[in-house]
């Protein structure tokens, strides 16, 4: 990984104004098919794009980068592909976490990791522990994650508090639920990028992207490079975020 010198992020936002980027990394399989290879080949190529994206984010003032690596629906893929993805996950943790740590990146895995085998769960625990004190980019890997699952697990936590008598139902509001979903302690997601040409969210961060800008590109994930990332940030910088409001001075919209 080619990262800059480690230092805490500045309080001053970068020119693009984007603090938290989330990426739906789509197109590995189609990329592999174009090369006449099996899908696992595309996933390995996609891992190189992850390195580029992490490096770019860390070097360009982004506070948090969230990558959709494995959805809760991906278990429905062929068993051979799922197995290859799990092995790639273990390999990536083993090969990259020390580099992430050296470059002050904090790694977090969001999702229901209980379904993973004990070997992968242990790798996740050690990787998160190693980087927990880092103050640079926060890299969130969404693994066995679904936006609906995230909301449900948050609601269950609140329901348990009500059942225990520690919370009244009428005390529950959006902010309270927000404190019980993944990444609640981070800046809200500003920008969602989806590669691969599809124009849908695919059950990703449904709560967290309520006011995010969406950016879709036909570029397949293994081909997504620094120039593509910069293009997405430039598009974001040129948008006017209204958060449900109207344009300044526009009383007719």
UniProtKB/Swiss-Prot annotation:
Metal-binding recorded as keyword: yes
Effect caused by changing residue 74 to A: Decrease in activity
Effect of residue 71 to A: Decrease in activity
EC number per UniProt: 2.5.1.31
Active site as annotated: 26, 74 (proton acceptor)
Effect of residue 143 to V: No effect on polymer length
Stated consequence of mutating residue 26 to A: Great decrease in activity
Family membership noted in the UniProt record: Belongs to the UPP synthase family.
Role, per record: Generates ditrans,octacis-undecaprenyl pyrophosphate (UPP) from isopentenyl pyrophosphate (IPP) and farnesyl diphosphate (FPP). UPP is the precursor of glycosyl carrier lipid in the biosynthesis of bacterial cell wall polysaccharide components such as peptidoglycan and lipopolysaccharide.
Name of this chain's protein: Ditrans,polycis-undecaprenyl-diphosphate synthase ((2E,6E)-farnesyl-diphosphate specific)
Taxon lineage: Bacteria, Pseudomonadati, Pseudomonadota, Gammaproteobacteria, Enterobacterales
């Amino acid at each position: 990984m080619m990262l800059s010198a480690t230092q805490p992020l500045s309080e001053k936002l970068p020119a693009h104004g984007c603090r938290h980027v989330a990426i739906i990394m789509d197109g590995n399989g189609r990329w592999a098919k174009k090369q006449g290879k099996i899908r696992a080949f595309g996933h390995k190529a996609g891992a190189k794009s992850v390195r580029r994206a992490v490096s770019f984010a860390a070097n360009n003032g982004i506070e948090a980068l969230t990558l959709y690596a494995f959805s809760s629906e991906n278990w429905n893929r062929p068993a051979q592909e799922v197995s290859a993805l799990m092995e790639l996950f273990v390999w990536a943790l083993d090969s990259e976490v020390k580099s992430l740590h050296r470059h002050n990146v904090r790694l977090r895995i969001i999702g229901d990791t209980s379904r993973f085998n004990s070997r992968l769960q242990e790798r996740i625990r050690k990787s998160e522990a190693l980087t927990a004190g880092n103050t640079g980019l926060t890299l969130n890997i969404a693994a066995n994650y679904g936006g609906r699952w995230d909301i449900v697990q948050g609601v269950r936590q609140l329901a348990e508090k009500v059942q225990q008598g520690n919370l009244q139902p009428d005390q529950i509001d959006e902010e309270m639920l927000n404190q019980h979903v993944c990444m609640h302690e981070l800046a809200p997601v500003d920008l969602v990028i989806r590669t691969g040409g599809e124009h849908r969210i695919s059950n990703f961060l449904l709560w967290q992207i309520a006011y995010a800008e969406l950016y879709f590109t036909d570029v397949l994930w293994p081909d997504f490079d620094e120039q593509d990332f910069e293009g997405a940030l430039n598009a974001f910088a040129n948008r006017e975020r209204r958060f449900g409001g109207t344009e300044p001075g526009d009383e007719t919209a």
